[in-house]
């Protein structure tokens, strides 16, 4: 159990006693205290600040003067005590009792049980073999590891051989209590904690619902894990929905026409005409609730448009999950929908580790389908959990599970909602800083709202009004096509910036450009790590961890980068690591010279158009056989590795994609298209001509030829 401190005003120290550590009221942020003791004269100075935290820390007031405490503060005060010296012990016991109750209330079920278990100091003869870190401490290398992480991470890495904490696979005890609490917080019927990322969460959900022959309505933006789970593992038949890319390289949403019933029926007629007249032809639709680049869907709109055609809808919310805790985003949350027996069942997967409070790999699945219980299409817990156990380890890492538990506690509190509101405001202030102090790099938001500059509005107004983030189809700033009004908005918690090279008026290439990968490398050289970049776009994730000083540091570095661009600094000073590793290639180069060559490569290959065409129906690769069957051919080695120069028209054995974002450009079983071929050859050319900026590519293999050139290869099926 934790032992939080008592915060106090120096004026009252003599009027209570405690074995706990004390901290002066002026020196705490209130996250480390279990009770607060103030003098009556301090009430006006501190009580509003304490109340604003929304932590509900019990506050004791010592009446140190004749002035009575104003009754308007009563709803924020736990106890008021006098100066009676005979009752100091009584008052001290009251303070300690309140502190203990606060600590009990603050600890969620699984983490509470885990911390109590560690305190028991059991003697371990079970897994894991390091047994509380004792093994590590017997070797110098192990001791380094032990000292680096600290004792508790090892003590809490325990085995399910002791049933005290409950079973994580069949959901018993404290583990079950934690998931029930999370379901309550997120407004789900059931919640499943997953310890191998949302890649596994998606596969669990998809394997629970889909089988060979099922039709799955498939967002072409879906992460590769959805292809793996729905198509390669489950063997379902996809009907793809085309999606948008803009010239900057941002990932957009599904075209509005794709949600029209007549259009969907035309696709069914092409792919599975035998299902055309079924009431619900789609066993499942898989939709990205929010894209990697912060295009957010309206879940109510999606369900109203296509819900009657689907047994279930899976909203892959890997890149969101916090929307219901930000009031202006609530309408986009599928978990807050009012549903009836005619609606689809709802599944939501969330990467808690991305922008919520979880260790890496923590994820969760929310199941909201009791409104269809009793219908044949309903997947009950036992069947769903069978899929869960297919993908879950029998040796779970309990600290991961504990962070999921604590995350729910944070999000379920008023304090958690306050933190998200502050996060949104910090992001708004950062955008204003860029708009007011940078000239080349621009935030990806509307230029004006009702004729007034975006940055001239009050931050609080922007933080509570979605109008400041909406994609209106007639607006030109975003350059997305195919959207309907009120369909999408920019996630305020994705700090999106564009770099020079694309005309803001036409969306066409300009004469000079600054590819975002150059800015990303510059920032990494200076200790700032962006989430990702692509073409002329760069993304930074915003969470309640952010502070305005952190954002000021980022903007200051961006402004310094712009200065280097304007004065055309030598590359060796701007990107010293890239220069050092490739000095023969870049000797004597300036930063603008590098920018120009990379920009010219994009222009010559028209990469922005290639990237857009990869996800448009007219230029999607031709579907030849089910991805499951293509994968079987790969396993049986009925494949050959061919250079990309010879790959057009051949059937892919593997999915091909750049990572990030992890969205397949070619799916197993599809013919390699001219568009995909040209796109990956453009990446190959960049790797060869501009060393130091190679992207990560999966499903395409880069090999050095005898002439020293790096060439791209891909596996294709031999019998097709």
Swiss-Prot record:
GO terms for biological process: amino acid metabolic process. Its cofactor is pyridoxal 5'-phosphate. The modification N6-(pyridoxal phosphate)lysine is found at residue 354. It catalyses: L-ornithine + H(+) = putrescine + CO2. Gene3D superfamilies: 3.40.50.220, Aspartate Aminotransferase, domain 1, Orn/Lys/Arg decarboxylase, C-terminal domain, Type I PLP-dependent aspartate aminotransferase-like (Major domain). GO terms for cellular component: cytosol. Its EC number is 4.1.1.17. GO terms for molecular function: carboxy-lyase activity; ornithine decarboxylase activity; pyridoxal phosphate binding. Keywords: Decarboxylase, Lyase, Pyridoxal phosphate. It is an enzyme of class 4 (lyase). SUPFAM superfamilies: CheY-like (SSF52172), Ornithine decarboxylase C-terminal domain (SSF55904), PLP-dependent transferases (SSF53383). CDD domains: Orn_deC_like. It comes from the Bacteria. Belongs to the Orn/Lys/Arg decarboxylase class-I family. NCBIfam families: ODC_inducible, PRK13578.1. This is Ornithine decarboxylase. The lineage of its organism: Bacteria, Pseudomonadati, Pseudomonadota, Gammaproteobacteria, Pasteurellales.
């Amino acid at each position: 159990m934790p032992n939080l401190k008592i915060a106090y005003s120096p004026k009252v120290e003599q009027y209570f006693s405690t074995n706990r550590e004390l901290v002066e009221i002026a020196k705490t942020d209130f996250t480390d205290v279990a009770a607060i003791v103030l003098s009556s004269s301090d009430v006006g100075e501190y009580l509003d600040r304490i109340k604003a935290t929304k932590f509900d820390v019990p506050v004791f007031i010592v009446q140190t003067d004749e002035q009575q405490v104003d009754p308007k503060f009563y709803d924020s005060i736990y106890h008021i005590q006098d100066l009676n010296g005979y009752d100091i012990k009584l008052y001290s016991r009251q303070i300690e009792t309140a502190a203990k109750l606060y600590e009990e209330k603050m600890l969620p079920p699984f983490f509470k049980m885990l911390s109590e278990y560690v305190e028991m100091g059991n003697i371990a003869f079970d897994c894991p073999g390091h047994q509380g870190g004792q093994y590590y401490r017997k070797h110098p290398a192990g001791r380094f590891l032990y000292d680096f992480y600290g004792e508790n991470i090892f003590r809490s890495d325990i085995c399910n051989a002791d049933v005290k904490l409950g079973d994580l696979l069949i959901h018993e005890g404290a583990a079950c209590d934690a998931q029930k609490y999370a379901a309550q917080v997120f407004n789900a019927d059931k919640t499943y904690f997953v310890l191998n990322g949302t890649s596994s969460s998606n596969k669990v959900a998809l394997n629970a619902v889909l089988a060979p022959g099922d039709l799955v309505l498939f967002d072409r933006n879906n992460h590769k894990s959805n292809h793996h789970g729905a198509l390669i593992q489950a063997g379902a038949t996809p009907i793809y929905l085309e999606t948008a890319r803009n010239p900057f390289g941002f990932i957009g949403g599904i075209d509005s026409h794709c949600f029209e019933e007549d259009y969907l029926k035309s696709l069914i007629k092409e792919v599975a005409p035998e299902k055309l007249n079924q009431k619900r032809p789609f066993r499942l639709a898989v939709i990205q609730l929010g894209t990697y680049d912060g295009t957010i869907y309206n879940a109510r709109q999606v369900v109203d448009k296509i819900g009657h055609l689907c047994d279930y809808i899976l909203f892959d919310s890997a890149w969101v999950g916090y929307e219901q805790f930000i009031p202006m985003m609530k309408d986009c949350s599928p978990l807050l929908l009012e549903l009836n027996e005619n609606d689809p069942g709802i599944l939501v997967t969330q990467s808690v580790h991305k922008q919520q409070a979880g260790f890496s790999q923590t994820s969760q699945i929310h199941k909201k389908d009791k409104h269809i219980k009793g219908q044949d299409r309903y997947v009950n817990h036992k069947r769903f959990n069978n899929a869960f156990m297919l993908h879950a380890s029998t040796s779970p890492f309990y600290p991961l599970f504990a962070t999921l538990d604590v995350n729910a506690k944070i999000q379920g509190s008023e304090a958690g909602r306050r933190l998200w509101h502050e996060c949104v405001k910090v992001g708004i202030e950062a955008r204003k800083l860029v708009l007011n102090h940078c000239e080349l790099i621009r935030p990806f938001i509307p230029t004006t709202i009702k004729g007034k500059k975006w940055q001239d509005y009050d931050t609080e107004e922007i933080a509570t009004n979605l109008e400041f983030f909406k994609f209106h189809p007639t607006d030109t700033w975003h350059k997305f096509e195919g959207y309907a009004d009120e369909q999408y908005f920019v996630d305020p918690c994705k700090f999106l910036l564009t770099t020079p090279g694309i005309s803001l008026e036409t969306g066409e290439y300009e004469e000079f450009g600054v590819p975002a990968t150059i800015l990303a490398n510059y920032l990494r050289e200076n200790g700032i790590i962006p989430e990702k970049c692509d073409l002329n776009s760069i993304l930074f994730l915003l969470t309640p961890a952010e502070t305005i000083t952190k954002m000021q540091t980022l903007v200051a570095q961006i402004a310094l980068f712009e200065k280097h661009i304007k004065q055309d600094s030598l590359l060796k000073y701007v990107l010293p690591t890239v220069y050092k590793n490739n000095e023969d290639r870049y000797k004597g180069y300036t930063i603008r010279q590098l920018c120009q060559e990379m920009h010219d490569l994009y222009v010559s290959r028209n990469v922005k158009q290639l990237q857009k065409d990869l996800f448009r129906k007219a230029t999607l690769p031709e579907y030849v056989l089910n991805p499951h069957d293509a994968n079987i051919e790969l396993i049986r080695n009925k494949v050959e590795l061919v250079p990309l120069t010879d790959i057009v028209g051949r059937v892919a054995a593997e999915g091909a994609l750049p990572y990030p974002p992890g969205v397949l450009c070619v799916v197993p079983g599809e013919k390699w298209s001219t568009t995909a071929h040209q796109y990956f050859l453009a990446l190959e050319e960049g790797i060869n001509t501009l060393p130091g900026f190679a992207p990560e590519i999966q499903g395409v293999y880069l090999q050095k030829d005898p002439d020293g050139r790096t060439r791209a290869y891909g596996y294709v099926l031999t019998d097709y």
